[in-house]
Amino acid sequence: MAPKAEKKPAEKKPAAGEEKSAEKAPAGKKPKAEKRLPASKASSKEGGAGDKKGRKKAKKSVETYKIYIFKVLKQVHPDIGISSKAMSIMNSFINDIFEKLAQEAARLARYNKKPTITSREIQTSVRLVLPGELAKHAVSEGTKAVTKFTSN
């Protein structure tokens, strides 16, 4: 029974704490306002927490081609789906191809002693990296996309 008696005063203490917090609430508003001005460091820490949220957004902005792979899949085969593992493999494949094309375009620009990679370097790198018929189709689609982009 002694523990019950100890619990009752403990229960009374939070009630007293609630009364104190109720008493401090009006007075607490003024110190909070006062604290906000010098506590800009605290708000910057809160901004730091906002940065973490910003970091989460940055993680979301990681470049993936999953949406575009899915759109192309639905254009070609509307009734077929794709697993997440297969989507990840396709995304890695596209990243690898783009990296090879970029490296080859940079090499071509360096050979020609030009500081800028233009559509001509990209087109030549596509012809060098991709085989045969695939290169021809890629070049035609690329030129079509560039003309559409420049016309707008």
Swiss-Prot record:
PROSITE patterns: HISTONE_H2B. GO terms for molecular function: DNA binding; protein heterodimerization activity; structural constituent of chromatin. Residues 1-23 have a biased composition (Basic and acidic residues). The modification N6-acetyllysine is found at K7, K35. Pfam families: Histone (PF00125). It is found in: Nucleus; Chromosome. There is a cross-link at K148 (Glycyl lysine isopeptide (Lys-Gly) (interchain with G-Cter in ubiquitin)). Can be acetylated to form H2BK6ac and H2BK33ac. Monoubiquitinated by BRE1 to form H2BK143ub1 and deubiquitinated by UBP26. Required for heterochromatic histone H3 di- and trimethylation at H3K4me. May give a specific tag for epigenetic transcriptional activation. Keywords: Acetylation, Chromosome, DNA-binding, Isopeptide bond, Nucleosome core, Nucleus, Ubl conjugation. Core component of nucleosome. Nucleosomes wrap and compact DNA into chromatin, limiting DNA accessibility to the cellular machineries which require DNA as a template. Histones thereby play a central role in transcription regulation, DNA repair, DNA replication and chromosomal stability. DNA accessibility is regulated via a complex set of post-translational modifications of histones, also called histone code, and nucleosome remodeling. Belongs to the histone H2B family. This is Histone H2B.1. It comes from Oryza sativa subsp. indica.
